[in-house]
Amino acid sequence: MKVVVAIDSFKGSLTSIEAGMAAKEGILKAHPDANVVVKPLADGGEGTTDALIAGLGGERIDLTVTGPLGTPVNAHYGYLAEKNTAILEMAAAAGIILVRESEKNPLTVTTYGVGEMIADAMERGIRNFIIGIGGSATNDGGIGMLKALGYQFSNENGQDVGEGGQALERVSSIIIEKANPILKECSFHIACDVTNPLCGKNGATYIYGPQKGVTPEIAEELDQAMNHYASVTSKFLHNDYASAEGAGAAGGLGFAFLSYLNATLTPGIDLILNAVELEKELEDTDITVTGEGRLDHQTAMGKAPVGVARLAKKYGSKVVAFAGSVTPEATACNAAGIDAFFPIVRGITTLAEAMDPKNAKSNMTTAVEQVFRLL
């Protein structure tokens, strides 16, 4: 019997690989001769870098970059030598987790550090990039990232436009020739789960700006500035991605990747499943095991476990999911490809006890073993 295990992290408790290995232990207790393959799982958001480093034997590269507030922050990215690929999370350099509530200012926060991470990887000879752009603190249209990669943005007096959302309305000319020439050798694959355009009522500023400090008083001004930036970009680069799906992601960072770096934007789970080559293992599997910390109605709407299930169903595999907790609405997961799901917690316990890594591993192993005794 072949079993493929791909479980998302139990945030604050188990990493993807830790959860997967605990499940593998349970399977082998029930079926010692089973062929169990454990794959890392993530959705392109928080934890993706670490999951792929651990699951694919990657290297962690630590560095100091410019944070969203313009001050140095410690960041890291992953390097997969066999694929000559870097795994980055923009939030490591420009994430909202790096900004206190009182410090949120869409006019000044910058994505410059994201560009520094990419530049560092290019200097090391890396040419392929998988980048998650969730959790941003920024609304600068990606202009900070692009400046770190060599692009020059000037105002009507030929001066640098500065940083943050306030820089967008000042853009008068773009010197494309100053961009790092190595960029032409690179491919960028962006994990993006939003479809918003760059501007307008459904764009970056109006939809995602409020959580980053955009007030009603400055929303219209910022949106107009973003539209101006898009127009100048179109003039100098001879393309137009302002209305493209995902252009409004991460405060317009999606637009920057599309317009300047010829990137592809792909739903996070699809991009990660391809990166870990999960489908190849599912072609001849008998049972697929997946899961996450909490199974609920959101899981059924396309989160990582359902992404695994849909892929497994292409090859007729049974799919079993395990979770720390399961809500009544999780029954929607059955129609989404998960044949059966089970909570791993045994008995009444506190949240802290349930999330303790030692307890979570033990609970996972026991729950999986008992289910697999029926299979």
Name what the model sees in each region.
Residues K2-I133, A137-L375:
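N-terminal loops that bind phosphate or other acidic moieties
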